[in-house]
Amino acid sequence: MGGNHSHKPPVFDENEEVNFDHFQILRAIGKGSFGKVCIVQKRDTKKMYAMKYMNKQKCIERDEVRNVFRELQIMQGLEHPFLVNLWYSFQDEEDMFMVVDLLLGGDLRYHLQQNVHFTEGTVKLYICELALALEYLQRYHIIHRDIKPDNILLDEHGHVHITDFNIATVVKGAERASSMAGTKPYMAPEVFQVYMDRGPGYSYPVDWWSLGITAYELLRGWRPYEIHSVTPIDEILNMFKVERVHYSSTWCKGMVALLRKLLTKDPESRVSSLHDIQSVPYLADMNWDAVFKKALMPGFVPNKGRLNCDPTFELEEMILESKPLHKKKKRLAKNRSRDGTKDSCPLNGHLQHCLETVREEFIIFNREKLRRQQGQGSQLLDTDSRGGGQAQSKLQDGCNNNLLTHTCTRGCSS
């Protein structure tokens, strides 16, 4: 007598903005400087994604809203095989959400901590894949400023993807960046020199230096310079001046020559473009079209039978988080019913104003919707671009390009 009960996926109105209810929360997998990350499944399409969520009040208190908005503005114009691409962004009363590609292979920092041995062949392919991503970012005038193992994720086949654009910046023409940004052990000499008022600024070569430090660390298990977050800047600059990088005698001469070119202290002489790196003899045999198509298989493939992340993230979300994601729906409903009653506890005026400004100026994005629009109006689009950036800039219905420009530029306490 058992009927055939098929669970049909829910159907959402195409014109309805994507929101939290469109996703099923599966588990927490990470946290970063600006929020936490969990695995989600979109209820209608059953597609899996990673969802990063950032508490609005905490972002305001830490003066991080501008960085979140900058990251959203940059990511909505990008799409590339070796980036972690943005699919949706939305908000509710508590949080800002970014839904991105799900990459279950873990980040390179995790695998270094698991004592994975990366062969020269694997690192050589990583360098090529990351070079294509950096060239793409350069085409859109973007300096990432935080290339490091923590921000490079692997997909299930072992290919690399750059993530975390929250301190990226955009430079046009001959402009140079001049602020101190990045993670000290991976920052190029010219970034420190700017801080000490000894330099004219910096540009794209800083990301290629970081690539060199990362590649060295993957091969050797430690970095070429003993630099930590607490190391004074004058000491770091002196280190660059007097210390020589030691390369393993077991590495082939071609790899050593490539690393030397990436770790050249003078940015004008450093390998810092796809053309530069394709001219390096060590990479003369590389089929770059095959690299772009992910047709070359890395020597290291993450374990498919396990989740390649720290399992304590899930425990923290379930036990320690004061506002856990899985209880959000009930919590928001309770808050809404309480608002306006004598039991409600009003926020201080400045914080309330900041929250309202964030709500008004948040950048909503829907790549799925943009693709539908592109299909309907393809004659309007720039079909020459491999990425989606130029086409997306012509379709403003799917995204809001505001930046938080006039309020909430200082932290506020609740």
Curated annotation (Swiss-Prot):
Name of the top EC class for this enzyme: transferase
EC number(s) on file: 2.7.11.1
SUPFAM superfamilies: Protein kinase-like (PK-like)
Residues annotated for ATP binding in this entry: I29, G30, K31, G32, S33, F34, G35, K36, V37, K52
GO biological process, one term: intracellular signal transduction
The keyword Protein biosynthesis appears for this protein: no
Pfam families referenced in this protein's UniProt entry, alphabetically: Pkinase
Catalytic activity annotation: L-seryl-[protein] + ATP = O-phospho-L-seryl-[protein] + ADP + H(+); L-threonyl-[protein] + ATP = O-phospho-L-threonyl-[protein] + ADP + H(+)
CDD domains in the record: STKc_Yank1
Superkingdom of origin: Eukaryota
Keyword Glycoprotein in record: no
InterPro entries membership: Kinase-like_dom_sf, Prot_kinase_dom, Protein_kinase_ATP_BS, Ser/Thr_kinase_AS
Residue ranges annotated for the Protein kinase domain, each copy included: 23-283
Family: Belongs to the protein kinase superfamily. Ser/Thr protein kinase family.
Official protein name in the record: Serine/threonine-protein kinase 32B
Record organism: Homo sapiens
Higher taxonomy: Eukaryota, Metazoa, Chordata, Craniata, Vertebrata
